[in-house]
From Swiss-Prot:
Region (Disordered): 1-26
Location in or out of the cell: Membrane
Transmembrane segments: 38-58
Ranges in a coiled coil: none
The entry's keywords: Membrane, Transmembrane, Transmembrane helix
One Gene Ontology term, aspect cellular component: membrane
Biological role: Overexpression confers resistance to the antimicrobial peptide MiAMP1.
Residue stretches of biased makeup (Polar residues): 1-20
The species this protein was found in: Saccharomyces cerevisiae (strain ATCC 204508 / S288c)
Protein name from the UniProt record: Protein YLR162W
Length: 118
């Protein structure tokens, strides 16, 4: 079955020039430039009200502190963490690790490793 295209009387004939084709077709009605005026208004709103708004006031609380974490000075368990090591008090010496010394039972202690001479 062969289909043929026929022109109807309601459509105007197309011509070779673009100008005459545009004038021959009925003009489509668009909404009155609502999209073209809305975008610049949104840009102006963003610039004026959002980017130019003042920064929120600085809050002084412990959750905003991004620096070094310091121990609570009222807590005796963490008090040692706040004292510099060179100026520590005498009671911190009790908590420091003990130095171990090795004692030998004989006159000549055995070496830990065998000495290999070449």
């Amino acid at each position: 079955m062969q289909h043929t295209l026929t022109r109807t009387a309601s459509l105007p004939e197309r011509s070779s020039s673009a100008h005459s084709a545009a004038t021959a077709l009925p003009a489509l009605r668009r909404p009155p430039d609502s999209c073209e005026t809305l975008v610049p208004l949104l840009c102006i709103f963003w610039f004026v009200f959002v980017s130019m708004s003042p920064l929120p006031p600085a809050r002084a609380n412990k959750s905003d502190n991004k620096g070094l974490i310091s121990a609570d000075r009222n807590n005796k368990a963490t008090l040692l963490l706040t004292i510099p090591r060179c100026t520590s008090k005498s009671y911190t010496n009790d908590l420091s690790p003990l130095k171990m010394t090795l004692l030998s039972a004989g006159k000549h202690p055995r070496p830990f490793r065998q000495e290999h001479r070449c």
